[in-house]
């Protein structure tokens, strides 16, 4: 897998132990149902909106700024970052907002 075939990286990245850490922002540019790799830390924003994602597995654990996964085919927030420094945008996905509300309360 070539990272640049799936993502536009604004900044630089490092691959360590199969996990990509990005010093900048990440934009998913290819339509996929699942991310083809695992991200650890993204210092700025992570954008995977308007896609076909059915899962957030592979998303970064840490996002320093915005995390935008709106308009996908998600049914769960499993795999969602544990830290998001700014807005978490996830509308037009979940059938039920119960899990989303629980996540916001937890945050």
Residue ranges with predicted function:
Residues 6-7, 97:
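GD-rich hexapeptide-repeat beta-solenoids
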Residues 69, 75-107:
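Leucine-rich solenoid repeat scaffolds
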Residues 4-5, 13-54, 58, 62-65, ...:
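LRR N-terminal entry segment and analogous cap-like coil->beta motifs
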């Amino acid at each position: 897998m070539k990272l640049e075939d799936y993502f536009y990286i604004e900044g630089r990245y490092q691959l360590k132990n199969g996990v990509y850490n990005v010093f900048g922002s990440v934009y998913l540019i290819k339509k996929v149902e699942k991310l083809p790799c695992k991200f650890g830390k993204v210092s700025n924003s992570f954008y995977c909106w308007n896609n076909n994602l059915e899962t957030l597995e592979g998303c970064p654990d840490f996002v320093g700024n915005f995390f935008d996964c709106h308009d996908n085919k998600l049914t769960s927030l499993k795999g969602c970052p544990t830290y998001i420094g700014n807005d978490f945008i996830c509308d037009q996905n979940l059938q039920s907002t119960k899990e989303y509300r629980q996540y916001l309360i937890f945050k």
